[in-house]
A protein has these predicted regions:
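Secretory targeting and sorting signals
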Residues: 2-27
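Hydrophobic alpha-helical segments, principally membrane-spanning helices and signal/leader peptides
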Residues: 1, 7-8, 52, 237
């Protein structure tokens, strides 16, 4: 009898403990505990493929340029869950290559259609360019540069790298650069988030993370987190929700391995979720596509013969 009572007492104790645990899990405001080791990736992005019938021209095109990673280092990587959610939930160019090495000539090629013989990363004083560029073509353009100390800064400062700010190299638009090439700010305040929330974006926006957040000096995870903090700000903006904004995310060059293949992601309300294109695209394709989206009919340099990305991504 005593043994039976002990068994009953133990069962009652275990039942009471189970009730306590269940109650704690169901308490108001108590969510699941954060994962301690490998967290599951975020669900695929849902801000693409929400509209049909793309416009003939768009009001805004935004570029975000990351740094120095190959396609295989990013796509499928557990270190980049947010980027891969965008690749799965929006559009992905699977055969997109940079133009050359190192960084600077890629930035110049993408914005003017030519490298102009540049083969280094020297500052604007070494490469003054009085040539046409997308900044001039667009009619209104803005560069949002993270960690830049002042407008249109022409030299490196801390984690700001002038070689990643192509507008500073075009001497024929220096006045515009001084006005519209600005420190980016943060997600809680500053030039870019204000332009997004107020609907005052220029037609063309060039967005440059600092040397840590662009993956140049810091980890893939750091860049992935940075994009996760900023891209939802873009897709929640009035201009994106209205269906007149397209975002391109690309990398300037790969890690130096052969082929120079880099990830490029297309985010737009008209791009069906999970769209992939294996067409051969380059930074010149990005320039041509941007010109088309903004209604520009004269293509700069090699953009004139580059493949357009427009139809591949439903733009």
């Amino acid at each position: 009898m005593r043994r039976s009572l002990s068994v009953l007492s133990l069962a009652a104790t275990l039942a009471a403990l189970a009730l306590i645990v269940a109650s704690a899990g169901a308490a108001p405001g108590r969510g699941p505990k954060p994962c301690r080791h490998k967290c599951p990736p975020p669900p695929p992005a849902t801000d693409c493929g929400t509209k049909t019938g793309p416009p003939s021209t768009y009001a805004h095109v935004i570029w975000i340029w990351m740094e120095n990673h190959s396609y295989s280092q990013i796509i499928g990587s557990s270190a980049a869950p947010y980027i891969n959610s965008l690749a799965q939930g929006c559009g992905l160019a699977t055969n997109y290559t940079a133009v050359t090495h190192p960084s600077l000539p890629n930035y110049i090629a993408a914005t003017s259609g030519n490298t102009w013989g540049i083969t280094d990363d020297n500052p604007p004083s070494s490469h003054p360019l009085a040539v046409n560029s997308i900044f001039q073509q667009a009619g209104s353009a803005g560069s949002y540069e993270e960690s830049m100390p002042s407008n249109c800064a022409l030299s490196n400062s801390g984690t700001y790298a002038v070689r990643h700010n192509p507008e500073t190299y075009y001497t024929n638009i220096r006045t515009a650069c001084n006005a519209d090439n600005v420190p980016m700010g943060t997600t809680s305040g500053g030039a870019f988030v204000t332009a997004l929330s107020s609907g005052s974006l220029p037609k063309f926006s060039f967005v440059t993370p600092n040397l840590c957040n662009d993956m140049h000096d810091c980890s893939i995870q750091t860049g992935d987190s940075w994009l996760q903090s900023w891209v939802p700000k873009i897709t929640a903006s009035p201009s994106y929700q209205a269906g007149n904004t397209v975002l391109f995310i690309t990398w300037d060059e790969n890690d130096g391995s052969s082929g120079n293949r880099v990830p490029t992601i297309v985010v737009s309300p008209y791009t069906s979720r999970g769209t992939q294109s294996a067409a051969a695209f380059t930074h010149y394709s990005l320039l041509r596509t941007t010109e088309q989206l903004l209604g520009i009919t004269t293509f700069l340099g090699s953009a004139a013969t580059a493949a357009s990305m427009r139809s591949a991504f439903g733009l």
